[in-house]
Amino acid sequence: MTRRFLVAGQVQGVGFRWFVARHARGLGLSGFARNLPDGRVEVVATGGDDAALARLEELLRAGPAHARVEMVERHDEEDDPRVPTRSFEIR
């Protein structure tokens, strides 16, 4: 299963993508995090189990120290061959 998150708030320019990548890798997840032009961060994660994906969502809602997360949207999606399956990338 692939899970896509859209994170809104003060999440760009505060180390959010690096925070996500570090924790996702630690949870054994693959995928990517990238800034969107509208100020949100998109996080796409695959692999691991439901518990790992749920823990990642908790971490996204908390964010790093200098972030202010206002909203996290979650979408379960079919596996996408464009999503990395062996690493977690910062784009």
Annotate the PLM regions:
Residues M1-R91:
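Intrinsically disordered, low-complexity, mixed-charge
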